[in-house]
Swiss-Prot record:
GO-annotated molecular function: structural constituent of ribosome
Residue ranges of the region described as Disordered: 66-94
Protein name as catalogued: Large ribosomal subunit protein uL29
UniProt xrefs under InterPro entries: Ribosomal_protein_uL29, Ribosomal_uL29, Ribosomal_uL29_sf
Family, per entry: Belongs to the universal ribosomal protein uL29 family.
One Gene Ontology CC term in the entry: cytosolic large ribosomal subunit
Gene3D superfamilies per the UniProt record, alphabetical: 1.10.287.310
One Pfam family named in its UniProt record: Ribosomal_L29
Biased composition (Basic residues): 73-94
């Protein structure tokens, strides 16, 4: 399924596709790792790519609904470090 077709899917259909792809990945990994009966190991790679595409589309839709969510979600490493240092110094003082 191409990305253009994936973009046209509804949210519920995307969730169904994700569920199905995860099942395929789980069974493929089992067949490859334990049973050694997987004919084409490339199936694992392609399924992982499909899952990533579906998750990307899902995230893009979330950002369209809440455009400010992205800014509040991501903190740079320096900001996290500064925040943790402030919290630790407050514990030492208090």
């Amino acid at each position: 399924m191409k990305k253009i077709k994936l973009q046209e899917l509804k949210d519920s259909e995307i969730l169904e596709q994700l569920e199905e792809a995860r099942k395929v990945l789980r069974t493929s990994r089992f067949q490859y790792g334990v049973a050694r009966s997987l004919e084409n190991p490339k199936v694992i790679h392609n399924t992982k790519k499909k899952i990533a595409k579906l998750l990307t589309i899902q995230r893009e839709r979330q950002l369209k609904v809440n455009p400010g969510e992205r800014k509040s979600r991501v903190l740079s490493r320096a900001k996290r470090k500064k925040k943790n240092l402030a919290r630790l110094s407050a514990k030492v003082k208090g």
